[in-house]
């Protein structure tokens, strides 16, 4: 088993496997189209569908009403009611667009959500969530290192992990800790008190100093020049301007503190570059990609022949995500080609998440979600009342709203991983989904 490419025509069986892993859904037309292609041609096709059914979510209330005052406004009125409902509209807007196209970038966007996790109910105003989704969409075929820089000034993230409260004289380490432990290099084997081999508690303290003074911008009037998306602000007088010295895990690297907005941004970029220069960071991302697209566990041989070479490729490509995903999804290993071990199956080894189950069932039954512009009432009844308020909570996967910053247990928690999707409390939602799509009764 290796990263050598699978070069034959896919055929129906391997086309199904590729589509199940790379997309949230497919139909018979796409399946038979893909089955006659080789994997490179198939991936070209699956990266090319950029259909956007609706550029913005529909809100039934007029924009001049406070209830509809939420997406493009640069003001922040003191009373913005129904923010939970508006965040629900946003998650269902993304779902509607995803179901109406076949694009690997939708799967990659959700991968980025599982990597740089927020919970939409804990980020403040709904338009912050809108900007956050657009940021993930922007980087769904982009650069992981650049996303790590940009997301630090994302208003939703600043609120979610309290970094907007992080000041030089009153440090808050929440974001710094999760940035190292979950978002980038991840925690390695503990080799001493406060020493996790990949970073130390001292590095968390230093990282919090780097992140100090980054604040939410309530009116969203600062626009990132690269993404065109609103970002937070830098409070120079609340930033720790001292020199930061990191531990042996980062070769005792010294980082000069910024003293104005430009040098503070340079300090942030240098800090992120320091982390991404480490092989452990590349291995962490590749391990997550492998678990997301291939299977939840792997052998020592997989580590040596798949994970480590892909990690080096990720570094060589300066953390561009698409080349790594293409290498993995086109490999003989991904298709279980030439593997005689019956206990090491890749095809059929991942239990569908409630999100993928819903999307795939909608396409399988050729269920047409009502169009918001033509049938707004039925669209809301299905998208909000059934999916958002009923199916997803009952299934154990509230969309873009995991219970903790670590994400859904099925994504990361050993030894069960994706088996977490099946429990006595969540299995009924799967049965009811099928029944509802067949009968048209939303339960």
Could you describe each region identified by the protein language model?
Residues 65, 198, 203-266:
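Long, well-ordered, tryptophan-enriched scaffold segments
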Residues 14, 26-139, 222, 228-229:
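N-terminal accessory alpha/beta regions
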Residues 2-28, 278-317, 325-443:
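Flexible, low-complexity segments enriched for small/polar residues
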Residues 104-121, 153-157, 185, 210-214, ...:
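Glycine-rich, acidic and aromatic/proline-enriched surface loops and short helix-turn segments
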Residues 155-223:
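Activity-critical C-terminal alpha-helical subdomain
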Residues 29-32, 55-59, 122-126, 158-164, ...:
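Short, solvent-exposed loop/turn and secondary-structure capping segments
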Residues 125-134, 153-158, 173-182, 304-308:
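Short, conserved phosphate-binding/catalytic loop or strand-edge motifs used
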């Amino acid at each position: 088993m290796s990263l050598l490419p699978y070069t034959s025509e896919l055929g129906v069986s391997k086309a199904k496997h590729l589509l199940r892993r790379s997309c949230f859904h497919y139909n018979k037309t796409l399946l038979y189209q893909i089955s006659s292609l080789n994997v490179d041609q198939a991936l070209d096709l699956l990266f090319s569908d950029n259909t956007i059914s609706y550029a913005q979510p529909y809100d039934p209330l007029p924009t001049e009403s406070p209830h509809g005052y939420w997406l493009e406004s640069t003001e922040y009125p003191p009373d913005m009611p129904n923010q939970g409902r508006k965040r629900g509209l946003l998650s269902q807007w993304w779902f509607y667009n995803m179901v109406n196209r076949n694009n690997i970038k939708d799967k990659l966007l959700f991968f980025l959500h599982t990597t740089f996790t927020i919970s939409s109910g804990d980020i403040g105003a709904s338009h912050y969530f809108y900007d956050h989704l657009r940021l993930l969409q922007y980087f769904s075929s982009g650069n992981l290192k650049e996303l790590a820089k940009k997301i630090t000034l994302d208003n939703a993230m600043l609120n979610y992990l309290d970094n907007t409260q992080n000041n030089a004289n009153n440090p808050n380490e929440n974001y710094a800790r999760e940035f190292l432990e979950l978002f980038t290099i991840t925690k390695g084997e503990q080799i001493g008190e406060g020493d996790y081999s990949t970073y130390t508690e001292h590095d968390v303290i230093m990282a919090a100093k780097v992140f100090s003074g980054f604040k939410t911008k309530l009116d969203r009037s600062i626009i990132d020049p690269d993404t065109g998306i609103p970002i937070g602000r830098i409070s120079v007088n609340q930033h720790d301007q001292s020199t930061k010295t990191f531990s042996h895990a980062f070769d005792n690297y010294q980082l000069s503190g910024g003293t104005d907005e430009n040098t503070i941004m340079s300090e942030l970029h240098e800090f992120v570059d320091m982390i991404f220069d480490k092989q452990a960071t590349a291995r962490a991302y590749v391990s997550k990609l492998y678990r997301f697209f291939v299977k939840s566990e792997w052998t020592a041989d997989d580590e040596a022949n798949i994970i480590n070479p892909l990690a080096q490729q990720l570094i060589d490509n300066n953390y561009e995500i698409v080349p790594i995903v293409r290498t993995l999804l086109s490999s003989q290993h991904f298709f279980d080609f030439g593997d005689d071990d019956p206990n090491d199956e890749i095809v059929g080894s991942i239990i569908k998440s409630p999100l993928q189950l819903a999307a795939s069932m909608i396409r399988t039954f050729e269920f047409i979600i009502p169009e918001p512009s033509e049938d707004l009432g039925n669209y809301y009844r299905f998208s909000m009342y059934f999916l958002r308020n009923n199916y997803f909570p009952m299934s154990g996967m509230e969309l873009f709203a995991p219970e903790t910053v670590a994400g859904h247990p099925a994504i990361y928690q050993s030894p069960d991983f994706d088996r977490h999707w099946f429990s006595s409390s969540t299995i009924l939602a799967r049965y009811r989904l099928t029944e509802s799509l067949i009968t048209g009764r939303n339960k």
